[in-house]
Swiss-Prot record:
Binds 2 divalent metal cations per subunit. Magnesium or manganese. Mg(2+) 1 binds at residue 28. This is Riboflavin biosynthesis protein RibBA. It comes from Staphylococcus epidermidis (strain ATCC 35984 / DSM 28319 / BCRC 17069 / CCUG 31568 / BM 3577 / RP62A). Its cofactor is Mg(2+); Mn(2+); Zn(2+).
Length: 393
């Protein structure tokens, strides 16, 4: 499939057009027509009904639902994707409520500040959906995508969506969506690309605390951050001037290595070496909650069980059903942007960290190698990192 940029999609939406939004392969793997309520007209709904053929819904943010007292359709929501339907509605000035014009009228009433809760008949022919707070950064659904896109166009947080079905009634996927796009001259994007776009252009980290932190390796300032879309807590330790290509280490949390000094890995030794380097040369260490390359502590221990049976650190992850590396560095990039940093010298042997930061607009000016001694217990691990994961060691 050929996808368009988010910028082109935003422009199309501002022009009153519908676009196609495709979700992930491991989710519904389907495409929805999406339009912004503020920019659409009767033709939008008519096109969705005639060509899309799916259920026409009206994603809105929580504040609109609360203001208009739109209650959940079902208190015990058992939908496998957690789609938050409210009771269906018709605006009181409609007749049957089903025509393209009248569904447009109902959708427009949702964003009219003069609309009152009693202005809707319930049930009706339009199905509002409540988006999760923080949109696709919290839930990668079409509901959240529509509301996020509405905001990105500068409109009120409301849209209309409709699943795309084939002529035979099956759901359009893959090449079917590509043909639909070409036939109707529509822009098409993925929710994944929308997530990446938002992470690249928005600042979603919040400084919660800053303290002096004396350590065995020097005296630092420690900053504590949270994000708008998860319960993660991230710390950054800083020393010296950060203005010109500061030295930065992105360190993934490793309880076994950092705290218990496990010799199965080189994590603890790398953290200590990084702290010594930053103490001497200045810079920052961003400590990321990415235990086990993102699989979590217990799964990392399960991987260790497999390693004891002859697997390596890559094949163990794969055997457990994970990719070899699940880490994403957008939070680190956002923390750097919080400090107005866009160019860094990176302390790392891992090329994926270079790519991960560059994907979010951070330029790597220079690489500072971080070589620590091997132990009798981590030789195989280090060889796997070098030969299978491309680490520069």
């Amino acid at each position: 499939m050929q996808f368009d940029t988010i910028e082109l999609a935003i422009e199309a939406l501002r022009n009153g057009e519908s676009i196609i939004v495709v979700d992930d392969e491991d989710r519904e793997n389907e495409g929805d027509l999406v339009a912004v309520t503020e920019w659409m007209d009767d033709n939008t709904i008519n096109f969705m009904a005639r060509e899309g053929r799916g259920l026409i819904c009206a994603p809105i943010d929580k504040s609109i639902a609360e203001r208009l007292k739109l209650q959940s359709m079902e208190q015990n929501n058992t939908d496998i994707y957690g789609t938050h339907f409210t009771v269906s509605i018709d605006h009181y000035k409609t007749t049957t409520g089903i025509s393209a014009h009248e569904r447009t009228q109902t959708a427009r009433a949702l964003i009219d500040e003069n609309t009152n809760p009693e202005d809707f008949h319930r049930p009706g022919h339009l199905f509002p959906l409540i988006a999760k707070e923080n949109g696709v950064l919290t839930r990668n659904g079409h509901t959240e995508a529509a509301v996020d896109l509405a905001r990105l166009t500068g409109a009120q947080p409301a849209g209309v969506i409709c699943e795309i079905m084939n002529d035979d009634g099956t759901m359009a996927k893959g090449e079917d969506l590509q043909s639909f796009k070409e036939r109707h001259h529509l822009k098409m994007i993925t929710i994944k690309s929308l997530v990446a776009f938002r992470k690249a252009v928005e600042l979603n980290v919040n400084l919660k605390a800053k303290v002096k932190m004396p350590t065995d390796f020097g005296h630092f300032d420690m900053y504590g951050f949270t994000t708008n879309y998860s319960d993660e807590e991230i710390v950054a330790i800083v020393k010296g001037d950060l203005k010109s290509n500061p030295n930065v280490r992105m360190h993934s949390a490793c309880l076994t290595g950092d705290i218990f000094h496990s010799q199965r890995c080189d994590c603890g030794a790398q953290l200590e070496a990084s702290m010594k380097y930053i103490d001497e040369h200045g810079g920052m260490i961003i400590y990321l909650p990415q235990e086990g390359r993102g699989i979590g502590l217990i799964n990392k221990l399960r991987a260790y069980e497999l390693i004891e049976k002859g697997y390596d650190t890559v094949t163990a992850n794969l055997a457990l059903g994970f990719d070899e590396d699940l880490r994403d560095y957008h939070v680190a990039a956002e923390i750097l942007k919080y400090f107005d940093i866009s160019e860094i010298n990176l302390l790392s042997n891992n090329p994926k960290k270079f790519e991960g930061l560059e994907d979010y607009g951070i330029e790597i000016v220079d690489r500072i190698e971080l070589i620590v001694p091997e132990t009798q217990y981590n030789h195989s691990y280090m060889e796997t990192k070098k030969n299978k994961m491309g680490h520069l060691i």
